[in-house]
Amino acid sequence: MIMFYERSAVAEGDRQLLRDFHQTIAQKEDDARITISELYQNCNVAVIFGSWKKLSKKDYKQDRAPHHILKNDIVKQHGKKPLVIIETPLLNRKIGRRHDYYRVGLNHFLNNLGEFNNKNCKPDRFNKLGLTIKPWRAEGDHILVLGQNLNDASLLGADMELWVITTIKHLLKHTKRPIHFRDHPENGRKLQWAITRNFHDTKQVKYDESKTIRDSLQNAHCCVAYTSGSSLDAILDGVPVIPTSQYNFVWEISSHNINDIENPKMGEREQLLYNLAYAQWSVQEIQ
């Protein structure tokens, strides 16, 4: 049985996408079902919308995030059976909930954890996105540290504030360049206060208040990231990235050590981007 979990999504548009996907599969598979239950239903294949993250006992007790509770239970009880995850796109991301494309992964949603069946792909899907791959930047000024939502599931439980402070301290040992930190818009002022508190005695560190990632990338020498999706924006813009997590989608073409900050690896982007275009599918294709 293939079970689609409607309540794994919060927004009505996302639930509708699951319903549409179910109808498409049901035309070919007699055992495709969809449920509005917030409990795991035994099945051969589970289909959910969105990633899952660890919740505290308090969150479980107060039922603060029923969709995450459901997805955690599915992951736990479903075991090693196939799990299909629909997530936000990797390329051509938009601000807001509705997207033209969605990432579809098997058993996970991150690099080196999920299976996307996208090795050595042709460039056709990438070309349809209308994206430009700028030449690797020969010169740049500042280092851009890419922050993430403090509660982001792609952190896999990592402490983003600790990562930011530790990363900047390491950078200060290896470069004299200005270090800019770009925060996630949903974090409020918490990380800005952390930057001020920890680096008030140096002018080398700056809290970046640019409105867009493109503005932040302007004249950047290199980025440092955990699993931020902005890593892909950076390499498209010609700015190399040093990811500190193997679950970052630019891991395969990048340096992995902050010691390389002055001469970061600039690997082949084209095949990576072609492959990533085959990890996401349009709403029309899913329907």
Briefly describe each language-model feature range:
Residues 1-53, 151-152:
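N-terminal pre-catalytic "stem/leader" segment of glycosyltransferase-like enzymes
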Residues 4-8, 49-52, 86-90, 140-152, ...:
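Short loop/turn segments at strand-loop or loop-helix junctions that form parts
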Residues 5-8, 167-209:
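Catalytic donor nucleotide-activated moiety binding site of glycosyltransferases and closely related
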Residues 14-25, 60-72, 159-170:
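Well-ordered, non-membrane alpha-helical segments in soluble/globular domains
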Residues 35-70, 75-76, 223-226:
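Short, well-ordered secondary-structure micro-motifs within conserved domains or adaptor modules
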Residues 55, 210-255:
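A donor-sugar binding/catalytic signature common to diverse glycosyltransferases
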Residues 96-140, 251-287:
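Leloir-type glycosyltransferase catalytic cores
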Residues 134-189, 273-284:
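Active-site donor-nucleotide binding/catalytic segment of nucleotide-sugar enzymes
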